[in-house]
A protein has these predicted regions:
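Pan-zinc metallopeptidase signature
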Residues: 275-341, 366
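Intrinsically disordered, low-complexity segments enriched in glycine and mixed charged residues
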Residues: 340-412
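Transmembrane alpha-helices and immediately adjacent membrane-cytoplasm interface residues
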Residues: 59, 63-73, 77-109
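Membrane-interface segments at or immediately adjacent to transmembrane helices
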Residues: 99-164, 176
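Post-HExxH zinc-binding segment in Zn-dependent metallohydrolases
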Residues: 125, 130, 224-267
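Membrane-embedded alpha-helical segments of integral membrane proteins
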Residues: 14-72
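Auxiliary, metal-adjacent structural segments of Zn-dependent hydrolase domains
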Residues: 139-196, 202, 206
């Protein structure tokens, strides 16, 4: 039998193509310049046309067919071959459908913090946006998360300004899985890499779910790296005219920026947030924690960390926090920089001038918006509720007050 008639040969070829450290210029030209714009036209139409998850439906259909084949007399051998070839096809197509996105030119310097003054300006600009949008945004979210088509348009707008490449077509639906289906494993959203189909866990409250939806839509726009997807999601929401999207993104961005502050300055910054903001974060963290299985989440996190490292993401899961640095560098795409005497935040609410601490020094508060709880819980990440942050702002004691460390691991 010839080697290329064996499924495992093709499967190994797919793995090899995925692990090759393709030059960014090649990934930009092939993936961003050709494959993604063409393939997304097909996937966006399919995903937008069907309210339920196509990816989940195909998976269930495949499992049913496999069981039927196994039960059929003499069908075990055929079932094994079919399963092998299905795996080979998935591995071969993954690099072109999504995997090359990890090799593209970064939208911001990787692993480099911006100037300290830039973080202070970002905190002020984001706080101003949070104060302005809290009232109308929370009122809108009381009726549910905003329409996915609106979020899709906001993400597409930012994506077009960030990259000099043909614009991909984004889906206008984000599929809801059964509550807890993702949060149990420590994640709040996921994108199907072959169909570019975004999903979220509806076990989260509306503000957090909106942040997750933005993050997953950013993945469908070709931002495979977690830090870039999160930064694009926050930029898209902050600049969005929809008040619910703007509030959800502002809350997530403020949470991430707060994490970089020393404890006292963090507390002062959080104290300047509008009424209800801290409660919204706490509600997201509580919802994520109510579903999370510590053992399962830890195992999935280790696996996903290894996956990210294998695709060239330095630090694996640590990439999530780099979104803060990218957000600060690119914030002018969404919000104008406040002038010296401008904005609600200056004077009355500004804290910490240029001070900040490294992401891993945030101590008692983990702020993570989406994906995982990790990311923004979709932004707010859900979970390492082992840190107690004492009393916050108005004197309300909350575990992991900024509500964040958890939950947002989004990803594939």
């Amino acid at each position: 039998m010839r080697p290329f008639s064996r499924w495992w040969v093709w499967a190994l070829l797919g793995v090899a193509l995925l692990l090759v450290p393709w030059p960014a210029a090649v990934a930009d030209a092939v993936y961003l310049g050709a494959v993604l714009p063409a393939w997304s036209v097909v996937t966006a139409a399919l995903v937008s046309a069907v309210p339920l998850s196509l990816s989940a439906g195909l998976l269930l259909f495949g499992l049913a067919a496999l069981v039927a084949a196994l039960l059929w007399p003499g069908g075990a051998a055929r079932a094994g071959q079919a399963l092998g070839w299905a795996l080979a096809v998935l591995l071969l197509t993954f690099p072109l459908a999504f995997g090359l996105g990890y090799r593209t030119t970064p939208i911001a310097p990787v692993g480099e913090a911006a100037a300290p003054a830039a973080y202070a300006a970002a905190r002020e600009a984001v706080l101003t946006r949070l104060l302005v949008t809290a009232g109308p945004g929370r009122a809108a979210l009381a009726a549910g998360a905003p329409d996915a088509a609106v979020l899709s348009g906001c993400v597409a707008d930012v994506a077009a300004r960030l990259r000099d490449a043909p614009s991909p077509t984004l889906p206008t639906r984000v599929k809801a899985l059964p509550p807890g289906a993702l949060l149990t494993f420590g994640f709040s959203g996921v994108v199907s890499p072959w169909l570019l189909e975004p999903h979220l866990d509806p076990g989260l409250p509306p503000a957090a779910a909106t942040a997750v939806a933005l993050h997953e839509l950013a993945h469908t726009a070709g931002f495979a790296r977690e830090s870039e997807a999160e930064a694009v999601a926050l930029l898209a929401g902050l600049g969005c005219e929809d008040p619910a999207a703007a509030y959800a993104a502002a809350l997530a961005a403020a949470s991430r920026l707060a994490r970089r502050l020393p404890a006292e300055e963090r507390q002062a910054y959080v104290a300047s947030w509008p009424e209800g903001a801290v409660e919204d974060l706490a509600a997201a963290a509580a919802a994520a924690a109510s579903y999370r299985s510590g053992a399962l989440a830890a195992a999935v996190e280790r696996a996903y960390d290894a996956y990210l490292v294998s695709l060239g993401t330095e630090g694996g899961m640590a990439d999530y926090d780099r979104s803060t640095d990218a957000l600060v560098r690119l914030l002018d795409l969404a919000l104008p920089a406040p002038s010296a005497g401008d904005g609600v935040a200056r004077g009355r609410h500004a804290v910490g001038g240029g001070s900040q601490v490294a992401a891993d020094e945030g101590g008692d508060v983990g702020v993570a918006p989406h994906e995982a709880p990790e990311q923004h819980l979709g932004v707010l990440a859900v979970a390492r509720l082992q840190h107690r942050a004492g009393e916050l702002a108005a004197g309300v004691g909350v575990e992991d007050p900024l509500g964040l460390e958890a939950a947002e691991r989004v990803g594939v």
